[in-house]
Amino acid sequence: SAILSTKIIKLIGKRNPSGFAYELFLDEKGEKISKSKGNGITIEQWLDYASPESLSLYMYQNPKRAKKLYNEIVPKAVDEYLEFIEKAKNQDELELLMNPTWHVHNGNVPKENLIMSFSMLLNLVETSNAENKELLWKFVKKYKDNIIEKEHPIFDSLVGYAIKYFNDVIKTKKKYKTPNQQEKKALEALIKTLGSCNDKMSPEDIQT
């Protein structure tokens, strides 16, 4: 319709309308996202798993290039957002103008020290089996001491997003192997050994 309208305008001697080239959203296979197929991820789902700012950054970059929009792209997009925020702390005015998060936040990039990437946080959710923010925060504080939660509002929101993403996306695709007899005996021995450890033992002592 853009091409046709341009031809019509030329025929009547008027100025061509300004156009904007854009591409469609694609799923992980490179196919067009369709409501009937249910492929890809919706905007609402993204906002269940990550912040609006991470989505704004993803949309901001390469507007003329087709974008893949599916569940597994979210952690990467969030980590890119965190990296740009981290870079902004040491950038001058000119460099900030080239930083997309400066535009996403209307010139007020939040200043927050990065604790860990979103991908690493997802790994922590998986290994710790944490089902709530309070428990996951305890594991985070074991990784990095002297953290005050209220000083990390962005990361605090990521803690909640990570649990939701793991339960909805990662956990549903996990397949657990049924142990054979030899593996079962080894696991039972491990459980027995861990059960005999006292509370005062350090993680290093337990592992040795």
Segments and roles (model prediction):
Residues 138, 142-208:
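Basic, alpha-helical terminal appendages of large translation-related enzymes
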Residues 22-170:
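Catalytic adenosine-cofactor/nucleotide-binding cores of aminoacyl-tRNA synthetases and other
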